[in-house]
């Protein structure tokens, strides 16, 4: 899976050329992308954003929105990849960047969230900065593809940033 992720500083239209270039360079690779965070508030807006990305070559649409929006996307046959654990857009709600699921209450909440997204019809799930044992349990309990981002090797796949792989990261190196 190759990701052309949301780049709020470019907006969705600045990213469309990137999606097209990635698709041209990797025609047989699953390509996932997202609309910029908070660029859609309703299910109809999410479907519109997803169709725009699918129309230029994406294979699936990433969203960390609610299961109701995911259900609406799936009703319209949009393949959805969602997110549990540390969700960067929610860091101010949880006291900053930190591992999620280190205590029993949070671990159960992360698992329940994963099961809810699975039930909503997501085809994949990014599991970010969750203890490896919790990520393994999630992977065993859900039907969808799990992708670890700093959550150990117990998921179906590993999410890596090109900046990290190529050594472009300066300063603090995140856990993922």
Region locations from a protein language model:
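Short, acidic/turn-prone active-site loops that include or flank metal/cofactor-
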Residues: 5-8, 85-87, 151-154
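Conserved anion-binding
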Residues: 30, 38-120, 155-156
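Active-site/ligand-binding-proximal alpha/beta "capping" segment
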Residues: 103-143
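C-terminal helical cap(s) of enzyme catalytic domains, especially alpha/beta-barrels
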Residues: 19-22, 70-74, 137-141, 159-173
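Glycine-rich, proline-tolerant flexible connector loops at the mouths of alpha/beta enzymes
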Residues: 1-26, 37, 58-73, 122-137
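C-terminal alpha-helical cap/extension of soluble enzyme domains
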Residues: 40-43, 56-57, 130-133, 144-176
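Generic beta-sheet signal
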Residues: 34, 80-83, 147-150
């Amino acid at each position: 899976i190759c990701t052309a992720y949301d780049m709020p500083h470019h907006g969705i239209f600045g990213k469309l050329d990137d999606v097209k270039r990635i698709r041209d360079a990797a025609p047989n690779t699953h390509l996932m992308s997202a609309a910029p965070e908070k660029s859609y508030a309703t299910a109809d807006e999410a479907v519109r954003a997803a169709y725009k990305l699918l129309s230029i070559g994406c294979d699936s649409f990433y969203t960390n929105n609610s299961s109701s929006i995911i259900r609406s996307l799936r009703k319209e046959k949009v393949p959805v990849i969602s997110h549990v654990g540390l969700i960067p857009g929610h860091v101010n709600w949880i006291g900053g960047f930190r591992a999620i699921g280190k205590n029993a209450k949070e671990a159960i909440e992360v698992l329940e969230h994963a099961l809810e997204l699975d039930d909503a019809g997501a085809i994949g799930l990014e599991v970010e900065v969750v203890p490896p044992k919790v990520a393994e349990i999630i992977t065993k309990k859900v039907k969808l593809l799990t992708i670890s981002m700093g959550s150990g090797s117990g998921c179906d796949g590993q999410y890596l940033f090109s900046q990290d792989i190529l050594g472009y990261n300066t300063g603090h190196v995140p856990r993922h």
